[in-house]
Amino acid sequence: GRLFKITACVPSQTRIRTQRELQNTYFTKLVPYENWFREQQRIQKMGGKIVKVELATGKQGINTGLA
C-alpha cells in the first residue's frame, strides 16, 4: 500500500517557571493511505494542523520477507 509521510504540528502545554506557555510540537510519521483521514481528524481534534504531506516511496518495504 501507499504511505504518506506527514509532518504535523500540535500545541503542547509546557510549564515554564510560573507561567504556562503554549508551545508547538512538530512530529513526522508515516501513515498508511487507508488511515490517512482518521489520522487527519485525530490531529485536528488535538488542535493541531498538518504542515506537510509527502508520498513516501515504498522502498522501505523491500526487505520485509527477510526478517
From Swiss-Prot:
- Keywords, A to Z? Antenna complex, Membrane, Photosynthesis, Phycobilisome, Thylakoid
What is its membrane topology?
Answer: Peripheral membrane protein
- The protein's superkingdom reads Bacteria
What Pfam families does the entry give?
CpcD
Q: Which cellular compartments is it found in?
A: Cellular thylakoid membrane
Cellular component terms (Gene Ontology): phycobilisome; plasma membrane-derived thylakoid membrane
- GO biological process per UniProt: photosynthesis
Q: What SMART domains does the database record attribute to this sequence?
A: CpcD
Which PROSITE patterns does the annotation name? CPCD_LIKE
Q: What is its main location?
A: membrane
Q: Which residues form the CpcD-like domain?
A: 1-56
Q: Which InterPro entries match?
A: Allophyco_linker (IPR011134), Allophyco_linker_chain (IPR011064), CpcD-like_dom (IPR008213)
Which purpose does this protein serve, as stated in its record? Rod linker protein, associated with allophycocyanin. Linker polypeptides determine the state of aggregation and the location of the disk-shaped phycobiliprotein units within the phycobilisome and modulate their spectroscopic properties in order to mediate a directed and optimal energy transfer.
Similarity section: Belongs to the phycobilisome linker protein family.
Provide the protein name.
Phycobilisome 7.8 kDa linker polypeptide, allophycocyanin-associated, core
Give the organism, scientific name: Mastigocladus laminosus
Lineage of the organism:
Bacteria, Bacillati, Cyanobacteriota, Cyanophyceae, Nostocales
